[in-house]
Amino acid sequence: MNANSTYYLAQFDAAAEADKFALVRRWMDTEPLPFFKELREHRPILVTPQCTLLTRFDDVTEVLSLPKIFTVALYAPKMGDYLMAHDDDALHTREKSLMQGMLNRNDLPAVRSMVANIARNLLDRAQGQIEIVNDYCRMVPATLVQDYFGLDGADKKDLIEWSYWNQYDTFHNQPFDILSDEKRRLIVARHDETSAKLGKYITELMVRRLLMVKAEQAKNILFSLWYGLHKLLRMLLGKQNDSGLKDDMVSRMLRTSFPDAVDFDIKRVGINAGGLLIGAIETTSQAVAQVIQYLLDRPEWLAKAKAAAQHDQTDEFDGIVWEALRFVPISPYLFRRTASEYTVGKGTDRATVLPVGSHVLPVTQSAMFDAQTFESPDQFIPQRNWYHYFHFGFGSHECLGRYVGMVMIPEMVRQVMRQQDVRSATKIDFKSGPFPERYDLYWNSMH
């Protein structure tokens, strides 16, 4: 295919209007890099019947910097009143700032050590063979959700399921996802079912942990005596008593007294605790599984990753992981809806007017291959400029827990790469869905 050919666009233009987006969706899912390259070169803003794709770095960053115009309105019916469903308003600014303070970046060395220990224990117990998605990629972040975020007292499999269906409905059940009506109803039903269970759990968690905080603070002797009776009753009923408060996110939030004017009461604490869970598990699992497969499929970079994984200094290894994610991101795009008419690429030959209510896909994977920003974009070059990656989003809706993810994701991959002769017999099985569901790995166990 020469530089002037338009293999994809020729088919797109020739297709019937009703068939155009199905073609686009198929190419995005099965051959994204050559498709996006052609768009960047020949039609960087592609208008389809369902949505508009933006493929240049400058256009992607422009729209993601305008949250009141390019909104997350499509999140709102799925997320309820969580801060990420709000666009540049008081609640979003206030709660994201509060939560970023709680997620103290000074914790990160300890968080990475925690992740490493969890990961090593799982791999050691596996003794050379593991189904990595369910027994590792999901299990490590689920354990961190309990131990660091403080969502204890629930089965890890429940935490995983609650995260899974929230993520599925919010990010993969949108107008530009090609699904049957039956499948859409199933996703919504499972989301509703798991959200009800999550809500009940969060309520119980808040009550239980608030009692512990109040007793710890010894606000009054009678309350401390009551809490002692509560523990005795649990013991007599055969229930495990809490061993005391640890330093985790839930404890930090409940230990902190906020003035009424800050509007961060126990209900808001609970909503934000649930948000930590939902955002942590499935995204991490997908990123880790896909990076592992990417490296196993490329002997040159596998060898370099395995060598770097042995070093205590992790910068070299982490750079390999982030560059791999450029090629296999958890999603090739973000999505927004316009609240007002806007011209993207104004003053250029690609200028396009987007009417109110347009669905817009800033194609972040394509932006990470834009030669205007990424030198030699088709080459695998670790240690690129971190700020040009979109692995945790961009702008006001950049991932709340990105700094946790920045140590958790590479450390999980690193522990796998430290295993002797790690290998896979098959590709990741997505089971016709958006997430990795099965991926069997083997290595030479020392046990």
Where are the regions a protein language model picked out?
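Cytochrome P450
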Residues: M1-H447
